[in-house]
Regions:
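Non-catalytic, polymerase-adjacent accessory regions of viral genome-replication enzymes
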Residues: 1-49
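A conserved non-catalytic segment of reverse transcriptases
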Residues: 226-272
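A residue-level signal for conserved active-site and pocket-lining positions in enzyme catalytic cores
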Residues: 74, 171, 252
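Short, conserved non-catalytic motifs in the polymerase core
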Residues: 46-71, 89-92, 151-175
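Short acidic-glycine loop/turn motifs at beta-strand connectors
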Residues: 52-54, 209, 257-258
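Active-site-proximal segment of RNA-dependent polymerases
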Residues: 67-117
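N-terminal low-complexity, intrinsically disordered segments
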Residues: 22-32, 77-78, 82-85, 126-131, ...
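Conserved polymerase palm-domain catalytic core
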Residues: 103-201, 205-243
Length: 272
């Protein structure tokens, strides 16, 4: 279906809704336009904390009711327009933390980098521009971006900005789409330096048998410049360079000559 405006977007949502959410729109265009207004969207979210993989908690802002279903439908509609790059392993069919980690087995050096405040950094404007680059027109990009973002407090700018909530069924796909240029540029950088690059959501990993990771190295300076010019910031506290012989970890899995979970790693130690 050629999605040109709110009417054709609503029609597309209506067609996929029985498969994604088990219902059909009742008010159709009215439902979509009403939920696209910030004052209505803000009332249709719930917040709660979940434990992080390492320590502390992560705040989840999850849509409820019809808005959640509409976001699920939007993800299904937009997905065919996005071709997942080889370097992306998060929120991609047939890929996982295991396929991500497998790229970095048996390497002398493994560098882990975390993107700070990943989802809140991806604003309405960035989503809209990325959807237009994907081929959607301004009207459709605007509606999708408003339906899938929520006002969030930006500590750095000291203001509210519409951004992707961590907990929306549409946020994973939309975040990958926004990261298209970042992934392309980092893949090209990695290729120039003979390094392997992969990304799982906000976790970026670089690995190689030779070192390009010395402090203030040209590689690290170029990497930081690409990240910041792409609208993200590196979380310095979570940056880790792991050398061969130490426990090298990628997205929660141990990588040596093969990928192991923590339980498998402990079992291997006991039987060694």
């Amino acid at each position: 279906m050629d999605i040109k405006n709110s009417h054709t977007l609503t029609k597309a949502i209506e067609e996929v809704a029985p498969f994604c959410a088990g219902w059909a729109l009742t008010d159709k265009v009215g439902d979509i336009r009403r939920m696209a207004q910030a004052r209505f969207r803000s009332l249709m979210y719930k917040e709660f904390d979940i434990p992080k993989r390492s320590e502390g908690t992560r705040r989840i802002t999850a849509p409820t009711g019809k808005l959640k279903d509409i976001q699920r439908c939007i993800s299904a509609i937009v997905a065919p327009y996005y071709r997942t790059p080889e370097c992306v392993h998060g929120f991609a069919e047939g890929r996982s933390v295991a396929t991500n980690a497998r790229n970095h087995t048996g390497r002398n050096y493994v560098l882990n980098i975390d993107l700070k405040n990943f989802f809140p950094t991806i604003t309405y404007t960035r989503v809209m521009m990325s959807l237009q680059e994907l081929g959607f027109n301004e009207e459709v990009s605007d509606i999708i971006s408003r339906l899938c973002t929520i006002p969030m407090w930006d500590e750095q700018k000291q203001m509210f900005r519409n951004a992707l909530p961590q907990g929306s069924p549409a946020s994973p796909l939309l975040s990958n789409i926004v990261c298209t240029s970042l992934d392309q540029r980092l893949s090209a950088l990695a290729q120039r330096y003979g390094v392997t690059y992969s990304r799982y959501a906000d976790d970026m990993t670089f690995s190689s048998d030779h070192s390009v990771y010395a402090k203030d190295s040209k590689f690290l300076k170029e990497l930081e410049n690409i990240v910041e010019s792409s609208g993200f910031k590196i979380n310095e506290k979570k940056t880790r360079l792991q050398k061969k012989g130490s426990r090298q970890e990628v997205t929660g899995l141990i990588v040596g000559e093969k990928v192991n979970t923590y339980r498998q790693f402990t079992k291997n130690l006991r039987t060694a």
